[in-house]
Amino acid sequence: MAEPNEDDKPSEIKWREDTVGKLDLLVSLDFRMTATPLYSDIVLPAATWYEKHDLSSTDMHPFIHPFNPAIDPLWESRSDWDIYKTLSKAISEMAKDYLPGTFKDVVTTPLGHDSKQELGSEFGIVKDWSKGEIEGIPGKTMPNFAIVERDYTKIYDKFVTLGPLLEKANVGAHGVSFSVKDEYEELKSMLGTWNDNDKNSVRNHRPRIDTARKVADAILNISSATNGKLSQLSYEDLEHQTGMPLKDISQARASEKISFLNITSQPREVIPTAVFPGSNKNGRRYSPFTTNIERLVPFRTLTGRQSYYIDHEIFQQFGESLPVYKPTLPPMVFGTRDKKVKGGQDALVLRYLTPHGKWNIHSTYQDNERMLTLFRGGPVVWLSNEDAEEHDIKDNDWLEVYNRNGVVTARAVTSHRMPKGTMFMYHAQDKHIETPGSEITDTRGGSHNAPTRIHLKPTQLVGGYAQISYHFNYYGPIGNQRDVYVAVRKMKEVNWLED
């Protein structure tokens, strides 16, 4: 219902009025018919948890678990690894006709966490090389640039092979690295090698990872959390950086190697490693930042200490140099130029939140019959009994929840536990379960994300400044879809759109 913004356009990039066009092909891989497969042109059926080999670990506990197939994947379903392996083989075959030869790509990467690039923004002052304020230096005042050579005919060969960089370069994370050259040689005998007749083959004499089980064993063999020798090497590297004695943390497990066969017989506790600042030495329960406090390993911050103040000009501009309380945005449901809603906007306006689900893990299990029977068996929104009473809403009434972004149709759950002025809808309640049509849009109601929109937080775009530097799944911009308001109305008639 929102109208396009015609006034506030980006000023520093070229705005193109003509777009590429609509999405022509959507392919999804899933073991359940969630909302994404329902919209997809092609659905690749995936194996479930107990139909494939895989690894399971988490920062919630110090153990590593295996997945082993109790049965083969049903019908045409395959494991994730086998699906991508099949796709890579098909693409490589097609590339011989459509993309022969090699191509060069220029790839940009952001200034990296735990690297020299953390020093890119001196004194937290950002100067724009594109405006001539500072010299453009790749990896310092601008992104890194690398030339990557692509050969699409060899995608499959590379996919099923553990590549040669492990022989030459160190591996690791969080500023700690070590050589795995010996482990790479071990994997050749453990997993077998490719021996093609073609002397130009990129995979010749290299370890085979053509099955998910082999991939799992390769990961376990080159990880410092499952290989005691590599754990010792990781602490050795951190000792060199800090001058502090650390190798004793994993000394008792230096000769230990955790294999897939080991964890199949019994899940194993991971080996302490310098990659993480915790310590589970001698069976101690893992706790974060143990080595920082007890062994005086500097925190990975600008000062080497726990930091609350960020001396960076962008954080200062947004008033976030220190952790501060910020009130919510004003309760806007529609813009002045947006389409008018049928019947006019309703008086009940609430903050709209989408917390993690109570009867599902993201979209998984949310349509499971057993889980659905634990509550209302369809989409629900929660609001306070005070708000409900003031607007004649009774528990289990059908509601329309809407704003300029979209509409949700769901049953009301009234509760004294909900704060007045707030509504939430547990996330991942897909619209294919008991979702009626909307009286506002004349189409079926949307999912929990229908009223939300994605915002980028500007301070998360800062980089090249000590701990405020990018690393995948560590620090960087996220999709923030909070801080929105919705109007709420009772539905006059529930239409299931079945005609």
Where are each of the predicted segments found?
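Long, contiguous, secondary-structure-rich segments that constitute the structural scaffold
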Residues: 82-150, 214-257, 266, 356, ...
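Beta-sheet entry/capping signal
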Residues: 23-26, 42-43, 273, 298, ...
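Flexible glycine/proline-rich, aromatic-decorated loop/lid segments
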Residues: 35-67
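Phosphate/diphosphate-binding loops
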Residues: 15, 24-25, 69-92, 400
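Long, low-complexity segments enriched in small/aliphatic residues
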Residues: 120-368
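Glycine-rich phosphate-binding loop of nucleotide-binding enzymes
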Residues: 1-38
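Glycine- and acidic
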Residues: 65-73, 382-383
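Short His-Asn-centered micro-motif
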Residues: 28-30, 46, 355, 383
